[in-house]
Every structure is written in C-alpha cells, then in structure tokens.
C-alpha cells in the first residue's frame, strides 16, 4: 500500500540518485593503458601543448604510464575516481598521457622529435606512474637541460590526499618557496 511516508521516501531517493554525479570510467586503450576521457588529445608537440594550457589558464602535466602497472590502474580507479580530485585537475591542468615504452613520436620543448620511450629516458622517468609538472611558459625551457625543465615531479603512486596536494602544490606555485613535504605539513589536517 502506498502511504504518504513511502511516497516521500521514494521521491527523496530519486532526488538523491538524480543529484549523484555519474563518473565516466577510464577507457582501456589499445596500448594497454587506462585513459580518462578528459585527458588531453594532442599532436604531441610539448611546447604547443604547454602554451595551449596556459592560454586556458591551466598548467601542463605529463602522466607517464606502463601497461600492466598496478599503481597506474590504482591512480585511475581510486585517485581519479574521487570527484574532488578529478574536478580540481580538470579545472586547473591539462594532462598528457605518455607510455614509458611507447613508440609515438613526441616533439620535446627543444624541438627534438623522439619516441615516447626515448623521451622517458631523456627525462629520467623510471617509475610509473610518474607525473611531470612544467612551468607556465614553454619558451625558456628550450635552453634548459631536461631535468631542469620541470617544476615538480611525482615519481610513483601517491595516496589520494597526497595526490591532490601535489596538484595544489603546483597550481599554487608553492614550489617557489618550499618543498612538497613542507607544503603537505602546512596543510590543515
């Protein structure tokens, strides 16, 4: 029997379900990597990608992954699954996904074209996932050695709260005055 109480409970349930965000699942690509639907689609010209991100008032980051990497998968299914994390990243960053053993050709900031695998070696990327964060302008990077081009790096998996903190660290330019560890310690508990 339909009572007023059951009707109200049903209406409230529908409202809650309707308000719940539906998260788009990561897609398993042909190269065996999971990809978020909001990742940057790119011609793999890093200077152009960085400048395009800057024009959109965003920062540019490269996510390095490897097929079969359990922590890469966890980054997608745990870290990116949190709405506060994915919303913050989408609003403030352009994320380019690269494969540490990939064969696609990428044009580095210095104009040199390399395979993804060669680019990973050039930058000393050894762990997956690794996130490389770059400054706001591409032009000065051309003259710098590869490892001096990034403003921050997250080598390996970070738990969700630390992961979000790393993106905040870069967005807030805290790297100009303190280490990531100092930044995390300064955050409210």
Where are the regions that the model predicts?
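A short beta-strand-turn-helix
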Residues: 42-58
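Short active-site neighborhood of thiol/selenol oxidoreductases, capturing the structured segment around
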Residues: 56-69
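Thiol-based oxidoreductase modules, predominantly thioredoxin-like and allied folds used
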Residues: 89-113
């Amino acid at each position: 029997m339909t009572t007023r109480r059951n009707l109200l409970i049903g209406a409230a349930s529908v409202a809650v379900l309707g308000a719940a965000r539906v998260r788009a699942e990561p897609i398993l690509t042909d190269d065996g990597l999971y990809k978020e639907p909001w990742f940057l689609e790119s011609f793999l010209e890093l200077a152009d990608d960085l400048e395009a991100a800057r024009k959109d008032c965003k920062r540019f980051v490269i996510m390095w992954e490897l097929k079969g990497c359990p922590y890469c998968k966890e980054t997608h299914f745990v870290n990116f699954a949190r709405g506060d994390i994915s919303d913050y990243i989408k609003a403030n960053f352009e994320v380019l996904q690269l494969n540490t053993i990939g064969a696609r050709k990428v044009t580095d900031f210095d104009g040199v074209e390399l395979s993804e695998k060669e680019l990973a070696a050039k930058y000393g990327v050894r762990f997956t996932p690794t996130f490389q964060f770059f400054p706001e302008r591409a032009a000065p990077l051309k003259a710098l050695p590869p490892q001096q081009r990034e403003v921050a790096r997250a080598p390996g998996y970070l738990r969700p709260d630390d992961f979000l903190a790393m993106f905040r660290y870069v967005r807030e330019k805290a790297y100009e005055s303190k280490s990531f560890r100092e930044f995390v310690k300064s955050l409210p508990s």
